[in-house]
């Protein structure tokens, strides 16, 4: 079990205030790492760090701003002297403020260019910049693990029938940008793994399945029905995978995509 021990290591988690970001922070801290919880909102990431006690700290940063990320990296190195793990978790998953307009706005033919550009900026450029700024420090140190959080929708296309209620009415469509950006994250993961393999930095992706989080009952039931394990994921279901990818337990693993999806992509 010592292979999973992260004692003495420093981990940065972006999007730390999100549903899964909080879990990633907790898992890494429980494995012994000192965790830097990073989010664009200072107050929310401070609340995450507070829950970690002495095992973590909050430093707000904008993943789309290289100056902000350099300040983050410098602050972490000044504090702990090292960066061992980077979890690129920050991402946008489209939500439509007006439920009445969601169906039409989410159609591919109507999908707003502004939403497309914003998701590309955060979900793809954000991963690129965090890896470029923070990962470059890891490469210079000759060690590290980068974990890019992707999605099953980076592997398979969205099943639009999941968003259809029991009366057969399409509530909305899963939009094109989330699968596109998560597919890009997987390609970028392979690129970076090959590029930094000789520098001692491992780069892997973690692709979570759908997480139960207050969705309509019909969606939860239908998603569970088409998943071999018969349920959606709980937010805690990815803790072990994050620790595994961050630790020496996955020491001969790079350029891989670890699917933790209850078998969703197996059928």
Indicate residue ranges for each PLM-predicted region.
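Canonical Rossmann dinucleotide-binding motif of NAD(H)/NADP(H)-dependent dehydrogenases/reductases
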Residues: 3-36, 192
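Conserved glycine-rich Rossmann-like NAD(P)H-binding loop of the short-chain dehydrogenase/reductase
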Residues: 33-47
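The beta1-alpha1 cofactor-binding region of Rossmann-like NAD(H)/NADP(H)-dependent oxidoreductases
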Residues: 42-43, 60-72, 113, 237
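Substrate-binding pocket helix/loop in short-chain dehydrogenase/reductase
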Residues: 97-108, 112-117, 160, 223
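C-terminal substrate-recognition "lid" of short-chain dehydrogenase/reductases
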Residues: 128, 143, 231-266
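Active-site helix of classical SDR
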Residues: 131, 181-184, 189
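Short, small/polar-rich loop/turn modules that mediate ligand/substrate recognition or access, typified
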Residues: 197, 202, 253-255
């Amino acid at each position: 079990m010592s292979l999973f021990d992260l004692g003495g290591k420093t981990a940065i988690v972006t999007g730390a205030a999100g549903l899964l970001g909080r879990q990633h922070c907790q898992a890494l801290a429980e494995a012994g790492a000192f965790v830097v919880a990073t989010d664009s909102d200072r107050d929310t990431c401070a609340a995450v760090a507070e829950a970690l006690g002495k095992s973590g700290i909050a430093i707000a940063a904008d993943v789309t701003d290289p100056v902000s990320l350099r300040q983050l990296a410098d602050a972490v190195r000044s504090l702990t002297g090292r960066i061992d793990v980077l979890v690129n978790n920050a991402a946008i998953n489209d939500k439509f403020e007006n439920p009445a307009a969601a169906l039409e706005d989410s159609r591919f033919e109507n999908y707003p260019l502004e939403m497309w550009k914003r998701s590309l900026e955060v979900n793809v450029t954000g991963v690129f910049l965090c890896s470029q700024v923070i990962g470059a420090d890891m490469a210079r140190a000759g060690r590290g693990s980068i974990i890019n959080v992707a999605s099953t929708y980076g592997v398979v296309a969205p099943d639009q029938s999941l968003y259809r209620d029991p009366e057969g009415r399409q509530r909305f469509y899963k939009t094109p940008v989330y699968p596109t950006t998560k597919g890009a994250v997987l390609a970028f993961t392979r690129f970076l793994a090959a590029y930094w393999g000789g520098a001692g930095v491992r780069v892997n992706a973690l692709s979570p399945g759908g997480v139960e989080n207050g969705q309509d009952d019909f969606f939860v039931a239908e998603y569970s029905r088409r998943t071999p394990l018969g349920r959606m994921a709980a937010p805690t279901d990815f803790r072990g995978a994050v620790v595994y990818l961050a630790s020496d337990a996955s020491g001969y693993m790079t350029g891989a995509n670890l699917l933790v999806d209850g078998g969703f992509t197996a059928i």
